């Protein structure tokens, strides 16, 4: 569910994995792993994602 929402929101906002990685201070590979469901971001990164996409947690 998280991975699907992340992909959908990123595409809706027309951002690349690189764009999100730069805003969060992580690697593009980290974003790719989140979108693949291999790992999930910590709470601080989730809060930052919510701010970027203007959604609530």
What are the functions of these language-model segments?
Residues 4-19, 23:
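Short basic helix-loop element that most often maps to the first helix and adjoining turn
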Residues 7, 43-44:
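Short, Lys/Arg-enriched C-terminal cap helix and immediately downstream tail that follows
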Residues 26-40:
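Recognition helix of helix-turn-helix/homeodomain-like DNA-binding domains
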Residues 44-57:
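DNA major-groove recognition helix of helix-turn-helix/homeodomain DNA-binding modules
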